[in-house]
């Protein structure tokens, strides 16, 4: 009895020592929700008390086999390293998507008064500038007062009340955009600035058509590497544009070749993470995009030059040429395409880098679960997967509903962002702050999707965003002026949560062999919302409250429509159309416990 007690005491001490040294693993595991797995790591078989029964045949036993399989699948240091590498294109994709906000942005300018100054020898802030124009509105940039009683040096008294159109302009030298580069001033040229954003979104729309096909046909790593590297080349050429039309052409090319970067990185991270780490992977990728927005804002604030912005944003993308040597292909994509030997090598490397042992029995069980297909599954896979989708009313209904949710997300998200310019402040600071606000929203999404489920998180965030947007119309004016701002930011917070949720939800609702293609279709539909959202400020000229009413009604509709989706919390990613149709059923949840993800 005493020897048993001593053995148990030694075991406890060994566990305590290992607990201290393995504290980072515990924290990571708690975030994943698999504390039992991490406890098994540092309370290994070598520390077990002598009285612990062992299988007589020298094998690990049934429980050991299951644990070995879970070890291979756990979100450990291997996954952390892979996410660190994937973070580069995810950072850059934010800059690729939103750089036009600064490259084609407004700058301060005023009319040149040739009677008082020389274009080559003057300054933007001259003492008489305020008196040379009718007022401080937009008209002051495009019209000026005529000069009377001209002397060698102008004063406030030399201007008459007669106005004339400006022939040339003086720009604020503190920043340089295509507006000041090519004189895109006044209302007659305003369409050229807004066209840049439209062309960017059209390019992404076109690019998503090809990105989804390349990803599902040739692999996630292939499209991620190719799109990032080609974007780097195109973006650098873009920065040397000699006129507006060359700039516009490469804006389209940049957006087209880079359209699949974020979705490919997102899916690669999702398929790498497994069931327990899936929401964590979604949160990380969303936060990486938000951090990329912050970095873009800091670069723009520091350089204030559209050419330097493009070079600093697109230049690092050339490093993507190294990506095939640093990250593996998606395991789920390899399995779906019958490349089982490569999968085994990846899992062995994963176990080695995570400091785990893996035996042939665990690999054997892995092969049995993932490589042995029934005749029914093989017959299904011989069919065109897209034709299977078209032939399934469940999948088509799901696809249409997802597409509307994406359309609403992008329309409301970008619409609220664009209409927020009514709030005063430095544009660089405002851009950075809006990006930072998204990060806590993503982490709240992580908590809610893991604890409450995907369906309730998506539906409630849509509904609350709609309520916030509509509630602004009922706030009395005057002393209640701060309430609309709070409600407005609440709407932006909730639509950010729905944006994060719909990405992971869409990836979980569709089978592996068409996942990126269908995600691309949804994203393409959503891109229509981002194309239309720049026009929403024009609706305010008809009725000031019309944009927010439209945002609110669409959000409420999407929130109700999303209730038709099945809950995917705790289920494995479906590999076939049949599995996708049966998502959420008890047997699928059991499969998630018995097979790697």
What is the role of each PLM region?
Residues 87, 194, 225, 279, ...:
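Conserved glycine-rich helix-kink/hinge and helix-boundary motifs of the Major Facilitator Superfamily
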Residues 219, 240-245, 303, 475-476:
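Helix-breaking motifs and short loop linkers at transmembrane-helix boundaries and internal kinks
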Residues 94, 98, 251, 255, ...:
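C-terminal transmembrane bundle
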Residues 201-209, 290, 294, 438-443, ...:
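Residue-level signature of mid-helix packing/kink "hotspots" within the transmembrane helices
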Residues 56-80, 134-192, 353-418, 422-423, ...:
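Flexible cytoplasmic loops linking transmembrane helices in multi-pass membrane transporters
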Residues 208-228:
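Conserved MFS/SLC helix-loop-helix module at the cytosolic interface between two early adjacent transmembrane helices
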Residues 93, 258, 262, 273-324, ...:
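Glycine-rich segments within core transmembrane alpha-helices of 12-TM secondary carriers
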Residues 105-160, 280, 303-375, 552-590:
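Central mid-sequence intracellular linker of multi-pass
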